[in-house]
Amino acid sequence: MNGMLTNHDTKNYGARYEAPVGRDGTRWGIGWSQSSYDLSTNSFYNSLGQSRGFSFYGLTPVYRDRMNRVTAIYGYDHRKIKDRLRLKAAGLAGIELTTEKMANVYHAGISGSQYLPNRFSQYSLIYWYGNLSGGGKSIDGDYHKLTSDLLHVIYDGKTNYRVQLSVQIANRNLDGSEMFYLGGMNGVRAYGASEGSGDIGFTATAEVRRQTGIKGLEAAAFIDTGAVKSHNAALIQHLSGWGVGLRYNLDNSWHAQLDYARKINAQRDKVEPRDHSGHMWFQLYKMF
């Protein structure tokens, strides 16, 4: 199970279950998720929305040796999305405009990892094909996109150094549910989860972690940066931030992460009702 709650009315939660199939190491899984948001970005209207989704996915080992693993990943998602604009301008307050959309999305790709002395790398490359209906001429129909993630860690005694990169490219304008977002706990942490959206984009992080002397607890310092662009706009948006945090890992059980991040160049928040100089994030989950 997973979940996220921000102090600006963005909520994401879901559950999934997976199990081994056959004898080759293949695992199949099913999942359910729901997200909602309530954003006040201007004085004319509030943006509200809700998305519910069901997913099926699989992971099949392709290659494995002592240091390398390569896995084929594939799946299907069915999503129902409802967007609302709640007008608040004089004379129009209380009026809502509603759009209901449906998406069927398929994906296939590879993920892998490599273990070397004092080094670890993890990567993925995934192709997505989807069809959206109900969103209007600019976004309805077929779309294609490619996503990739890379993590590289170097261990040096009590210290480790991490570099992480996430990239998305797409062939056309995308619905908000498929866009790439710069802000959030897995992006530029100095900005909110819906900040900086587009069809094409990247985020990059450099992080240093140091053992504190308390078992499982590390202190961290990091820099995040990213850029994003939409097909229907010439502007490229850049966001950057820096921060500090704590990481706690109990072997194969609990994981907790606390971060406080501040902006670099202090670009104003656009999707939150007030501007903030930084954000705090907390994540907790348990492995079963």
Task: State where each predicted segment sits.
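Outer-membrane beta-barrel initiation region
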Residues: 1-27, 64, 200
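Outer-membrane beta-barrel "beta-signal"
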Residues: 246-256, 260, 275-288
